[in-house]
């Protein structure tokens, strides 16, 4: 069994439409195509082991297929912030292709060389019961960010569960509509020589997101191109 070691190893954790195998295959094709175009080598897919018995009736009924793909960039010198920037743009390209094909039930929880997002519609104390990986003693991390949030102004769903890719936030943003409209205006002026094509990053705020998910979208835009931190 090969051991894949190194900070340049990347993992994409995602939700796929569980009961539509044709859509699943389309999702996988889009992911592999965009990763290859971005000069990544794919090691393979992995079905994330889960225990659905800990879920409630609605959560189980709407439960997605959860899959990871392991991959690595072919440029060994690409690492750290530069690699994360490349991953950010690649994720946006994948998401935009999925929108073009009207794929529902597809959501990228994380695409990173630094972090993996585990999320879902279950009680906080059930996270390691549902995600069996978290029971494995070989599964280690320098730190973990945990957040529990009950949906108030949007219908609960797997993709809108906390945490998001950059933040864990309670939402309740009263200026959400205005901020969203202003972001749309600012998109027209966006420019950067750090990305392959700035159009790949638009729309910054993805359609159908909650207020905290929209904030996450914007945080990633501002932190991915530069050494800025969120604070």
Feature annotation, model-predicted:
Residues 25-27, 155-160, 177-181, 185-189:
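Short acidic, glycine/serine/threonine-rich loops at helix termini
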Residues 164-180:
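Conserved phosphate/anionic-ligand binding catalytic regions in large, soluble enzymes, centered on
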Residues 62-154, 162, 228-231:
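Active-site pocket-lining segments that scaffold enzyme catalytic pockets across diverse folds
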Residues 1-6, 222-231:
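Single conserved hydrophobic/aromatic residue that forms the stacking wall/gate
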Residues 17, 147-152, 172, 180:
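Short, flexible loop/turn elements at secondary-structure junctions
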Residues 174, 190-224, 228:
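Conserved catalytic alpha/beta cores of large enzymes that bind or transform nucleotide phosphates
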Residues 20-29, 33-59, 64:
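A short, surface-exposed, charged and often Trp/Pro-enriched helix-loop connector in the C-terminal portion
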């Amino acid at each position: 069994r090969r051991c894949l070691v190194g900070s340049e190893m990347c993992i994409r954790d995602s939700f796929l439409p569980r009961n539509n195998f044709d859509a699943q295959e389309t999702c996988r094709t889009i992911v592999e195509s965009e990763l290859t175009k971005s000069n990544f080598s794919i090691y393979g897919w992995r079905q994330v082991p889960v225990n659905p018995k800990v879920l409630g009736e609605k959560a189980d009924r709407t439960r997605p297929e959860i899959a990871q793909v392991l991959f690595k960039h072919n440029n060994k010198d690409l690492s750290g912030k530069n690699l994360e920037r490349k991953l950010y743009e690649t994720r946006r390209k994948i998401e935009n292709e999925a929108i073009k094909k009207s794929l529902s039930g597809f959501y990228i929880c994380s695409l990173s060389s630094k972090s993996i997002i585990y999320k879902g519609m279950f009680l906080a104390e059930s996270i390691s019961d549902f995600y069996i990986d978290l029971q494995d003693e070989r599964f280690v991390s320098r730190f973990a960010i945990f957040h529990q949030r009950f949906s108030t102004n949007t219908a609960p769903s797997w993709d809108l569960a906390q945490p998001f890719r950059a933040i864990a936030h309670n939402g309740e943003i009263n200026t959400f509509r205005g901020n969203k409209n202003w972001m749309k205006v600012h998109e027209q002026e966006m420019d950067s020589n750090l990305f392959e094509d700035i159009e790949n990053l638009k729309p910054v705020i993805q359609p159908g997101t909650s207020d905290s998910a929209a904030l996450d979208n914007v945080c990633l835009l501002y932190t991915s191109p530069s050494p800025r931190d969120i604070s």
